[in-house]
Amino acid sequence: MNSYMGERMGIPRDEIPRLREKYFREYGTTLRGLQAKHNVDVQDFLAYVHDLPLQDYLHPDPIQQKVLASLPTRNLIFTNADAPHARRVLRQLQIEEYFVDIVDVNRVDPHCKPSREAFQIALNIAGESDPSKCAMTDDLPHTTRAAKDFGLYAILYGSAVPSHFGAAALSPDMDAAFNDWSQLPALLNGSHS
């Protein structure tokens, strides 16, 4: 994103971090802020920022694969990226077969996670009217907080999970949290879905 903003848009490098933070706070994503304030072409932006050698960053995780294969749930990807990038990521991780649909930034346009409108669109696409029957896993606390406020069973995953946070502990930001994929089935069994 920094390269796009500097090279394609001519924004001075020293202004980029401040603008990214401002747009993220005000619009939910840097992209939505760039759309609102700079009339950026969404497809050009997405193509540029997603042109990455995923194999250098992402590697299949056998535990993640095993857990996802064991889930009796209908799984969707809900992302602020576009569907082609999400598919590339799923293929790289070798987990594409475990997801039935992708709700991407284009399908929720002009909204994005973590807005209520985006959650409602995703819920409609999932074919569910009751958010309490759905769980959402995300790696950002502000997204899990919004998901929980919307009525979803919100699960925080990854490096944002505080080390002292037990899997069953409650927080205003989430209903549950995990760092190890093998913990996910137990968390889903504890959900109200």
Predicted region positions:
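Asp-based, Mg2+/Mn2+-dependent phosphohydrolase catalytic module
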Residues: 69, 76-78, 82-83, 87-193
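N-terminal helical cap/lid subdomain that shapes the substrate entry/recognition surface
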Residues: 1-65, 84-87
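A short, Lys/Arg-enriched amphipathic alpha-helix followed by its capping loop at the start of a domain
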Residues: 63-73
